Amino acid sequence: MDILAIGLVVFSAVLHAGWNILGKSHAGSGVAFTMAASLSACLLLTPYLIWYLVTVGWATLPMAFWGLLIISGLAQMVYLVGLIVAYKHADVGVIYPIARALPVMMVGALSMLLGHSLTQSQWLGFVLITLGCMLVPLTGFRQFTPRSYLNVGVLWALVAALGTTGYSVIDKEALLLLTQAAGDVLGNSYSAIFYLGVQFWAMVLPVMLWCVVTGNRQELQRAWKIRKAASMAGVMMASTYGLVLFAMTMTDNVSLVVALRQISIVMGLLMGVWFLAEKWHYTRGAGVVLILSGIVLTLGKA
């Protein structure tokens, strides 16, 4: 990976861990927090979206791009809702690592199916990252058994991980179509920001429509009540994934970007201990070592 791409992903990890702390603080809001945060990002980026479409031309973008965008938006919503609901049942330090690291192996496998190659050391790095994330939720090494992961919180974290896997692979393919279509007019960085904005709209519109159709207007009211904290999280969410999307334009294999993003697990753990007074255990320390070792192995041959 390019050194600039690595720097962008690492900085995005700091922001990602930060908005997860805000999400934990408002875990009881569930879908409302996710909706409010996503909508704030939509409104922030809408003027840019209009400028981009006027500059590039609506008809320039292929229909396949819009189809991938819709699917990616739904996958993002699955991830966000799964994550926030999981926080109702467990610590940030438990849920965050599982939801973020499990997709490493999943995206790696999908990348292979799409024709990308991975070295043995990179696969070993993926395994270490995944093992590290499995250790982090435990309070003791004797708990490293299947029973420790059979609970509602981890189940929702798995749902979030599936969402992450989906949008990570789809976004890379959609970005490729977008940059090819707009490449003669605007550079890749402009297209990455545009994709970020339209993706947020693809996330939030289905949820708002669902609330209206089902008569669940309480979620809309709750979203309004927590708009200040959610807006801050929305800005962080937009900044976080915008940096990742830009990094994706600099590398062919999205699995490397996904693996590097797991440094946010370490940051999330530290923030959970510092800001939310969550406990630190030896297992979490061991998990952090495995995660960092896995990242080094993954990038060593990248």
Annotate each PLM feature:
Residues 167-176, 249:
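Extracytoplasmic gate region of multi-pass secondary transporters
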Residues 71-76, 87-133, 197, 201, ...:
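Specific alpha-helical transmembrane segments that line the substrate/conduction pathway
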Residues 13-17, 46, 73-81, 101-109, ...:
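Hydrophobic/small/kink-forming positions within alpha-helical transmembrane segments
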Residues 1-14, 18-23, 28-71, 80-90, ...:
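Membrane-interface interhelical linkers
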Residues 45, 108-109, 121-140, 283-302:
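Hydrophobic transmembrane alpha-helices of multi-pass small-molecule transport proteins
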Residues 238, 242, 250, 254, ...:
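Hydrophobic alpha-helical segments
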